[in-house]
């Protein structure tokens, strides 16, 4: 079940050898494609070990591994656009908790997933590691209940 040219319209970054890397926060770079299996509930997981942002107070770099897991509905995020989007945080000054919530909200706006969670495993600074977790389940569905359950159990994994 290969994808045809029409299904790939709007995917402009994958395979593009002249990729330009954004110098500032760039949610508009995110691209989506149709989920061919919207009737199946399944997780898609991204592990992004090279995330960098800036401390809004000191301007010093913060490093993290960002974990994104979602259950797609109609749309899915294209991975190269996600890579470039995450790269766009490199010169963006925000707290760890803000970065995780911004990433989640931007992906919700792009895909409208059934469920999504974003976890940031930030490298310790000043002897303290910060690991923010944000999630969302589509209102009025079983995924709203899943989100609540996962929120309270996320740290037991």
Swiss-Prot record:
E.C. code: 1.7.1.13
Active site feature: 55, 62
Catalysed reactions, as listed in the record: 7-aminomethyl-7-carbaguanine + 2 NADP(+) = 7-cyano-7-deazaguanine + 2 NADPH + 3 H(+)
Main localization category: cytoplasm
Cell location: Cytoplasm
Residues that coordinate or bind substrate: 77-79, 96-97
SUPFAM superfamilies tied to this protein: Tetrahydrobiopterin biosynthesis enzymes-like
Listed Pfam families: QueF
Keywords recorded for this protein, A-Z: Cytoplasm, NADP, Oxidoreductase, Queuosine biosynthesis
Keyword flag NADP: yes
Pathway: tRNA modification; tRNA-queuosine biosynthesis
Iron-sulfur keyword on record: no
Example of a GO cellular component annotation carried by this entry: cytoplasm
Source domain of life: Bacteria
NCBIfam families, A to Z: QueF-II
Family: Belongs to the GTP cyclohydrolase I family. QueF type 1 subfamily.
Protein name, UniProt field: NADPH-dependent 7-cyano-7-deazaguanine reductase
């Amino acid at each position: 079940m290969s994808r045809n040219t029409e299904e790939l319209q709007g995917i402009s970054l994958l395979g593009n050898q002249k990729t330009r890397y954004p110098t500032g926060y760039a949610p508009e770079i995110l691209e989506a494609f149709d989920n061919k299996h919207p009737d199946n509930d399944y997780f898609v997981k991204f592990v992004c070990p090279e995330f960098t942002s800036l401390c809004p107070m000191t301007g010093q770099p913060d490093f993290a591994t960002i974990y994104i897991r979602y259950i797609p509905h109609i749309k899915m995020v294209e991975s190269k656009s996600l890579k470039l989007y995450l790269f766009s945080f490199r010169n963006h000054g925000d707290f760890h908790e803000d970065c995780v919530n911004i990433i989640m909200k931007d992906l919700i706006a792009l895909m409208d997933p059934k469920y999504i969670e974003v976890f940031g495993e930030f490298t310790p600074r000043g002897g303290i590691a910060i690991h923010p977790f944000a999630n969302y389940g589509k209102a009025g569905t079983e995924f709203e209940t899943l989100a609540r359950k996962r929120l309270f159990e996320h740290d037991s994994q």
